[in-house]
Amino acid sequence: MTLSIYDDIFKQFPTIDEWSEPNEKIILEPFTYLGIITAKELPSMLIKAFNYWYQVPPPVLDLILKVVGPFHAATLLIDDIQDDSELRGGIPVAHKVYGVAQTINSANYVYFEAYQNISKLTPYLKSPETTDLWSMFNDEILALHRGQGLELYWRDTFTCPTEEEYLRMVHNKTGGMFRVAIKLMKALSPVQSLPDYFPLVNIIGILVQIRDDLLNLSPAFTKHKGYCEDLSEGKFGFPLIHSIKADSSNTLLMDILKLRPKDVPTKRKALKYMNDQTKSLDYTFDVICKLEKTAKDELKKLGGNPELSSIFELIHLSSTPDIEEKYKS
């Protein structure tokens, strides 16, 4: 390299502005590393299922999937950093391989790519002058971050929320991701006078999150995220909240959470207490059953949807997960 390139620096600007495919691949590596197939993630599955009603044309539906699918996958990268997770899908999380800085940049890049794709939906709007897709997107992404922010605050200040506070948090955090997809579909649907599907969407969001909290304590989840990872992360999952509130005079769980335990014996002790003393796993399962019935009743009132029924079958739990083997001494 010589100083000659600076003789007329203005000639260099077009070259500087160029962006190559190899560079694109480099900055997306933390995102692509986990091999998340967005079509198999629940938000994308729900989009396809709700399209049974909305009948959004395939080219438009593909664009919505390109907004929501990658955005959801990118949030998982950030979640793993905020939770200091070790595993996702049974392999080391992206930030343990590429570092926190590269992973944050990659996730943010995907966020803005998704946001950019919203502009491609505008030509398909029935009333572009009165429909603001960006506001729809922003409202729910703000809700998502509000929910996530509260959950992190509770964790970092060792503040155990009530069940009602937890439900409002999940309504924002998990529900926001689901609602943004359905709002986009509603705005772009050619069907007139559709029922209000958002109560069903909101129930699904809460059902899915409480189910995930319960499964986090089960053997089936261990290979994907590690054994009782919520305890290591200090997270107030639904079973934990119930157990702590069931006997506020017993500080065992709060003491264990403050340790952020990595060792199995300490986690077993917490799990045994939740299962045997406060029956919190059975309580959580009962709540899941009640929410599932509410969701199915709402689905029936809306006239039914075979694709959504298939998703309910997929996420159905027939009993409280068998965790006995995990805390046997």
From Swiss-Prot:
Top-level enzyme category: lyase
Protein name, entry field: IDS-like terpene synthase 1
Residue runs in coiled coils: none
Matches recorded under CDD domains: Trans_IPPS
Assigned protein family: Belongs to the FPP/GGPP synthase family.
Cofactor note: Binds 2 Mg(2+) ions per subunit.
GO biological process: isoprenoid biosynthetic process
Reactions catalysed according to its record: (2E)-geranyl diphosphate + H2O = linalool + diphosphate; (2E,6E)-farnesyl diphosphate + H2O = (6E)-nerolidol + diphosphate
Co-factor(s): Mg(2+)
Source species of the chain: Melampsora lini (Rust fungus)
Additional comment: IDS-like terpene synthases originate from a geranylgeranyl diphosphate synthase (GGDPS) progenitor in fungi, after the split of Melampsora from other genera within the class of pucciniomycetes. They lack coupling activity and act as classical terpene synthases.
Keywords for this protein: Lyase, Magnesium, Metal-binding
The enzyme's E.C. designation: 4.2.3.-
SUPFAM superfamilies: Terpenoid synthases
Annotated GO MF terms: lyase activity; metal ion binding; prenyltransferase activity
Keyword Zinc assigned: no
